[in-house]
A protein has these predicted regions:
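Conserved hydrophobic "DFG−1" position in protein kinase catalytic cores
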Residues: 11-12, 21, 90, 105
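Conserved Nudix-box catalytic region and its N-terminal flanking loop in Nudix hydrolases
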Residues: 18-57
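Short secondary-structure junctions
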Residues: 58-65
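Active-site-adjacent beta-strand/loop module that shapes the phosphate/pyrophosphate-binding cleft
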Residues: 62, 72-94, 104
Length: 133
């Protein structure tokens, strides 16, 4: 099974106390779960370019500062994914669910209260451990 390359953004607010998350549409894979916004890396596209494009499309922000937070591969029964989780610490505009999906700022310490897909859980735990005060 071919691995699908995905970029996902950990979008921090200015003082790194909150992260912007979005809810997956009910009709999509892992529908109804919360997630770090992002999407597929297109052929001939760098991870950085994909992150900029996906966040403009999904949450309406222009990324100005990003760095790799974690690389992870995960196999679901029906698909294999290769993730690059990107820390986004500077951007222009206010994020919102541009494609009609629900989006919100969440205190980092409250992230475990939200249901995320299994592949996101190790990243979620690391974010909470490193950034909750």
């Amino acid at each position: 099974m071919k691995r699908i390359h995905i970029v996902a953004a950990i979008i921090f607010n200015q003082d790194k106390s909150q992260i912007f998350i979005t809810k997956r549409p009910d009709d999509k894979h892992k529908g109804g779960f919360w997630e770090f916004p992002g999407g597929k890396v297109e052929p001939e596209e760098s991870v950085e370019q994909a992150m900029i494009r996906e966040l403009e499309e999904e949450v309406g922000i222009k990324v100005t500062e990003q760095s790799l937070f974690e690389h992870l591969e995960y196999d679901y029964p029906d698909k294999s994914l290769k993730f690059d989780f990107i820390s986004v610490t500077a951007f222009e505009h206010k994020p919102y669910g541009k494609e009609g999906q629900e989006g919100r700022w969440v205190d980092i310490k409250c992230l475990p209260e939200y249901a995320f897909p299994e592949a996101n859980v190790p990243i979620l735990e690391r974010v909470v451990q490193e950034f909750s005060s």
